[in-house]
């Protein structure tokens, strides 16, 4: 149940703060990619798909990741702009799930993040026709050579490459307990605002 005296914004800020605390603890472990999570989407045909993405930003506006918009995930999000992102931190025995409605980030946001990427990753975004069939590895390497020669200096952001923001409707925190009596808490946005409650494990 929602704590007495806490307004909706305060509850939401508490949820975000707790996720950031988990991420900080994860960064202190030997996890190679502490911001890696499984993104689940569902397409027009009703079939789900899941894949690993990197959480690049988390603030009041939501959780941001970047990808090729022509990929399967991009196509599914165009058809059904809802997603769940699950981050599992094995060394901590903790997990975070963020569910929400998905919207594209602004072009300026995408440009800022693109400028931070290493050159090979930028070239790869041009060379890879993500999620499309590939005849051979040689085909991909040939496209990489072609874009290397096309962009000898600055690599512009491809029009098909951008970011998505999951605007949360729920944030769930899980931590392992003895006898599988785990601790589960959910922050959820309803018609009257954000609330916080426990869940049975």
From Swiss-Prot:
Its cofactor is FMN. InterPro entries: Pyridox_Oxase, Pyridox_Oxase_N, Pyridoxamine_oxidase_dimer_C, Split_barrel_FMN-bd. Binds 1 FMN per subunit. It catalyses: pyridoxamine 5'-phosphate + O2 + H2O = pyridoxal 5'-phosphate + H2O2 + NH4(+); pyridoxine 5'-phosphate + O2 = pyridoxal 5'-phosphate + H2O2. Substrate binds at residues 56, 113, 117, 121, 180-182. Pathway: Cofactor metabolism; pyridoxal 5'-phosphate salvage; pyridoxal 5'-phosphate from pyridoxamine 5'-phosphate: step 1/1; Cofactor metabolism; pyridoxal 5'-phosphate salvage; pyridoxal 5'-phosphate from pyridoxine 5'-phosphate: step 1/1. Keywords: Flavoprotein, FMN, Oxidoreductase, Pyridoxine biosynthesis. FMN binds at residues 51-56, 66-67, 72-73, 95, 130-131, 174, 184. GO terms for molecular function: FMN binding; pyridoxamine phosphate oxidase activity. Pfam families: PNP_phzG_C (PF10590), PNPOx_N (PF01243). Catalyzes the oxidation of either pyridoxine 5'-phosphate (PNP) or pyridoxamine 5'-phosphate (PMP) into pyridoxal 5'-phosphate (PLP). NCBIfam families: pdxH (TIGR00558), PRK05679.1 (NF004231). HAMAP family: PdxH. Belongs to the pyridoxamine 5'-phosphate oxidase family. Homodimer. This is Pyridoxine/pyridoxamine 5'-phosphate oxidase. It comes from Halorhodospira halophila (strain DSM 244 / SL1) (Ectothiorhodospira halophila (strain DSM 244 / SL1)).
């Amino acid at each position: 149940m929602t704590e007495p005296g806490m307004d909706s914004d305060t509850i939401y800020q508490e949820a975000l703060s707790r996720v950031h605390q988990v991420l900080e603890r994860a960064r202190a472990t030997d996890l190679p990619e502490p911001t890696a999570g499984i993104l689940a989407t569902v397409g027009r045909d009703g079939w789900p798909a899941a894949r690993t993405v990197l959480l690049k930003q988390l603030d009041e506006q939501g959780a941001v990741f970047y990808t090729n918009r022509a990929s399967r995930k991009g196509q599914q999000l165009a058809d059904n702009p809802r997603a769940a992102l699950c981050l599992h931190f094995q060394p901590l025995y903790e997990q975070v799930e963020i569910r929400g409605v998905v919207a594209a980030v602004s072009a300026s946001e995408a440009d800022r993040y693109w400028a931070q990427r290493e050159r090979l990753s930028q070239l790869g975004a041009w060379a890879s026709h993500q999620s499309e069939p590939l005849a051979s590895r040689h085909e991909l390497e040939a496209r990489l050579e072609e874009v290397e020669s096309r962009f000898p200096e600055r690599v512009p952001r491809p029009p098909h490459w951008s970011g998505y923001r999951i605007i949360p409707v729920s944030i769930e925190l899980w931590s392992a307990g003895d006898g599988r009596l785990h601790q589960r808490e959910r922050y959820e946005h309803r018609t009257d605002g954000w609330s916080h409650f426990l869940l049975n494990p």
